[in-house]
């Protein structure tokens, strides 16, 4: 594509993370701005290398997190800047057969498994919390015939003693659950539908109408126009921590 259309200014990469590095490296080397869909790569190190290359070439690299652009996210962030959170509960459960039918790459090493949706929740939590959190313990459930987990149960904290828990599961049928609940001294924040709905102290909030992807591309254009990059790897770092610190539990084989 780069050879056939040398006049393009930017590319957006949405292929599986195991194959992202080569495409991004080629585009950056050719002097193109690069928008990477989440997750930005299969490893932290390869994305860090791409960030250095973008800086050397003077082009923009945007490691995007689409869920951070959900309508409720900035409202929650502003509220938590004023009212310290004491507890966070994340429930991110969906049906993998519905959302990823026949996609074998997602079960391979580097495909993230249940962390493919779970990283969306982590991208929101790392955006809204006033302090950085870190993993304390976790259990990752691997089907006997797969190299990536189908479920994860994670416990986090931060320097203030925050209690944060996340439950990810790819086996939920029927209604899907993309929820984050945050306890504060001014009431509970309850986010639902991946950030499309929000209640504060039981009161439904009016939220911006702009969708995630129009907001994402507007931000990308702003980065390009101002000569900046945006490469926040904190959600991916939490996933790496989970694989490093979490206990592995083998469960029944899973066929998609």
How should each PLM-predicted stretch be described?
Residues 1-35, 39-51:
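Beta-loop-alpha module in the N-terminal Rossmann-like domain of NAD(P)-dependent dehydrogenases
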Residues 9-13, 159, 219-256:
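C-terminal helix-rich "cap/oligomerization" subdomain common to oxidoreductases
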Residues 101-174, 234-238:
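Rossmann-like dinucleotide-binding domain that binds NAD(P)(H)
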Residues 144-149, 160-224, 228-233:
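NAD(P)-dinucleotide binding in Rossmann-like oxidoreductases
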